[in-house]
């Protein structure tokens, strides 16, 4: 795929989405860079300007049925096509299940899972009529390995993995290729992480294990990948002649995901994650 493509990317106000928008635009693609709030587009505009490229920056809230549908319709009306979708928008909600409300779980699911569903609903009719689309979702090692104090986030990423693994062979019947990209720790602020341990009681029943897990997380982020590294892989996946279903972004993530698929009883994974707290 060497000709200019029309690439829609969600969650572009920061992090992986911002880096991906700059990368794809720098490679000559027509990028539609979307986010929930255009007031947060400053960093993206700066990144594009520094790279000497441009993008069509638009509002798109993937947690909203009507807004997502109308937003995609507008993109198709203005650009005529969407060749690649990078489903990147996501939120992280820290905490263990007892501490989190049902609304916390619902919010995570609405964006991280149903956001992808809404995007598929918007582009699949077009792709069936004109085969060749690519749907690439930013998942996580958390879609394979359940992690303490990440219950809602892991739930949503497990669900995303199941959704797209189920959808991929059906989509392929219409020439549509589906891939999941699974990063581990990535440097920079996860700006959409709307709730975190700081909002939990510092002296509650989970304070000590949370503190131990936070230390493990801090250590992991000392060796984190960069947003640019993940953006490069996303571009490679979009350019691949025969993209795979799953891509791990580092050797560490490959080992962890490999452990999960080999561990039929789950005890080795449980032993590993138990040591984190």
Predicted regions and their residues:
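Residue(s) in the substrate-gating loop at a strand-loop-helix junction
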Residues: 140
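Conserved glycine-rich cofactor-binding loop
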Residues: 13-15
